[in-house]
């Protein structure tokens, strides 16, 4: 395969051996290729900033091996019922005042009931009135539920694939890979932007990481947002004690995601507290251009806002303004015009 070009065609037919060849290139060659692609589609010094709030915490019936919110695991976690609307809106106002352009809300459910969906819709409508983009992660959705969220004004829906189809069963048994793909299809068909990525460092192989990216890049449309999480090990979960991923392997995965999905936002998600500033800077160079802002992500720690602000200043990076988020589209070879 020839080196990546700024005008390279956006593809949906990647083969795993091609992806492994990319991942295995000399580190500097891979980062140069990824950065070249990144510059063709985005301002390399702008990072989209989101804030994430847990609107319902704990007691989830799923058995995801990485998650402290699972009812299957012995974890010290204070369970919380669905938050009142005004508490959610106050958190959204605070996020807006600190520079967030998107407000993400997560509930520890297998899937929302119709009653809970009514309350969630009120949250979407209220946050939209504050001038923020909205994102939800509520578990699996039916096509009808996805359409209702779209009608309420939901901009993004997060539903991660987590890992490769082959490794998936070693992490989760209560929800199938196909269940996840079907929810993504319902979200896309409803006209909601898709946010979908995975978690690295769960004991998977490089091939598993390549297969995860292959699944995402070969969807009929690339996810507008691709969150890449570095496993946060929580005592009491089955994955506590897993050998940590080589940081360079994490950067390689970020770079490969950028090449495979040139017009998508690639987000550094959970696990940034374990990353030195230098590692985050490498990730930004390799094509990461989105972060979660705030001291906590659902139930796991996140770098403080002051730390992120200082890091941005040191790197000459600035938060992406809401009005500037129409940075890239899949149909326009190079720098382009539609919201991503």
From Swiss-Prot:
EC number in record: 2.8.1.6
Q: Report residues binding [2Fe-2S] cluster.
A: 104, 135, 195, 267
Pathway(s) of this molecule: Cofactor biosynthesis; biotin biosynthesis; biotin from 7,8-diaminononanoate: step 2/2
Q: How is the cofactor bound?
A: Binds 1 [4Fe-4S] cluster. The cluster is coordinated with 3 cysteines and an exchangeable S-adenosyl-L-methionine. Binds 1 [2Fe-2S] cluster. The cluster is coordinated with 3 cysteines and 1 arginine.
Quote the catalytic activity from the record: (4R,5S)-dethiobiotin + (sulfur carrier)-SH + 2 reduced [2Fe-2S]-[ferredoxin] + 2 S-adenosyl-L-methionine = (sulfur carrier)-H + biotin + 2 5'-deoxyadenosine + 2 L-methionine + 2 oxidized [2Fe-2S]-[ferredoxin]
Q: Which cofactor does it need?
A: [4Fe-4S] cluster; [2Fe-2S] cluster
The UniProt keywords, alphabetically, are:
2Fe-2S, 4Fe-4S, Biotin biosynthesis, Iron, Iron-sulfur, Metal-binding, S-adenosyl-L-methionine, Transferase
Q: Which GO terms describe its biological process?
A: biotin biosynthetic process
The family line of this record is: Belongs to the radical SAM superfamily. Biotin synthase family.
Subunit: Homodimer.
The identity of this protein, by name, is Biotin synthase
